[in-house]
From Swiss-Prot:
Keyword Lyase: no
Source organism (scientific name): Homo sapiens (Human)
One GO MF term: carbohydrate binding
UniProt KW keywords: Disulfide bond, Lectin, Repeat, Signal
Species classification: Eukaryota, Metazoa, Chordata, Craniata, Vertebrata
Domain C-type lectin: 26-131, 159-275
Signal peptide: 1-20
Disulfide bond sites: C40-C130, C105-C122, C180-C274, C248-C266
Chain intervals for the UniProt region annotation (Disordered): 287-346
Name used for this protein in its record: Putative C-type lectin domain family 20 member A
Amino acid sequence: MLPRALLLSFCAAALQLVSSKRDLVLVKEALSWYDAQQHCRLHYTDLADLQPSGLWKLYSLMTSTPAWIGLFFDASTSGLRWSSGSTFTALEWGQKLPEFGVGFCATLYTWLKLPSIGAASCTAQKPFLCYCDPDVGHLISTKPSLSLTTSPKPAVVQISGQTFMRFDQVMTWSSALLYCRSHHTDLADLQMVTDETGKEALRSIMSETEAWIGLYLNANSGSLSWSSDLGASIPSWLQVPMMVRGLCTALGIYMTYSPKVYSVNCSSLLPFFCFYDSSTGHRASAELPPLFHTSPTEMTEETTPRPGRAVASVGSGTDRRDTAAATEAQHLSSESKEKTSAQKSGHPFGILKADFTISTLMDPEEMKDQFLRQIQEVLKLTLGHEQFRLKWVSFEVNKK
C-alpha cells in the first residue's frame, strides 16, 4: 500500500468533482476496455463502477458519447462483473440492460438526458471513466484474472505454406485487423488461394455467417487493396462486390455454393479470418489502412461512412452465380422520398424495392435474411445512426 500522503496527492491531481474521498474523472483518450482499465489502475484506482454514493458525480461527467466503465461480461462465469471485484446488481434507475456476451464490455452515456448502459466489443476504442479512492490507491500491481473472452480456439487450415484461421469472436474490421496483426500476420489475404485444393481447404473453416477478410477499398488510391500490403492481386474465383469508402469485405458461404464476398459497414461486429506468413511475421506496428480520407490517427470506429453502394457476388469458373446485387444507397434514399409516407402507431414507414439476381435453383424466401442484411448496410450509410427496422414483405420474379 502506498503512503497515505502520496495517495492523496495522486488523487488530487485527477480531481474533477470533489465531494467525498472517492472521486471520478473522465479520460477522453480513446482506448480499448482492457487498456482503459490499465490506465485507470496506473493513474487512479480502477474503471468506474456505479456505487449509489457516486452516481450524481458520474451523471455530471456523462455525455452522449459512450465511455467505458468497469462492467464486463466474465466468460468464466457467463455473467456480468465489475473489474474492481464488486458484485453486479440491478441498476439504480431500472434500465433494462442490453444483451451482453463473450467479448463485450459496458459503456455509459446519456440518452434524452437520462443515463444509459450500452454494450460494445471490448476491443473498440472509446473514452473512459475512472475512479480514485485514496484509501485503496493504485491497483496496477493487482491484476486479477479477468476473463473478457474465452481462449480463442480458431478453426485452422494450411494453404500454400500459409496458415489461415477463423475466429468466432466478433469485432469491428479495424479491431479484428489489430488483433490479427498482434497475434498472427494480418487479416486474411487470399492471394495464395488460387486452386480448387486451396478453396476446399478454406471452405472447411467457413460458415454462412460472414467473417472479415483483409480486402478493403483504399481511400487514397480508390482501388482495392489487401491490408497485409503483400500485393494487390485478387484470385479469379473471388468475385468482389462494388465497394465505397466505409465498407469492408467479409467472406461467407451459402449451402454448397461457392464462397461469397459481402460488402459490410466496417463498424459492424463480425467474426474474422486471420492468416500467418512465416516470412512476414507479426505486423503489430504496421500503418493502419486508409479506409477514409483522414490520417490513420483520425480513423475511429464511430466514423459514419458516406452513402454508397453495397453489392455481393460470387463465382467460380463456369459455376458463377451473381447474387444479391444490392441497390445503390442514394437511389434507395431518393426513391423512398418519392413514396407516400404513412403513419402507423405514430411511426413513419416507407416501401423500398431492391433488385437481386440469383440462380433459379435458389429460393429467395430462404435467402431473405441475407438480402435484408445487405440492404440494411446500405441504409446505414445513408441514415447514419437513425433507428430503423426492415421487414420482408414479398418478392416478385422479373420475367423480362
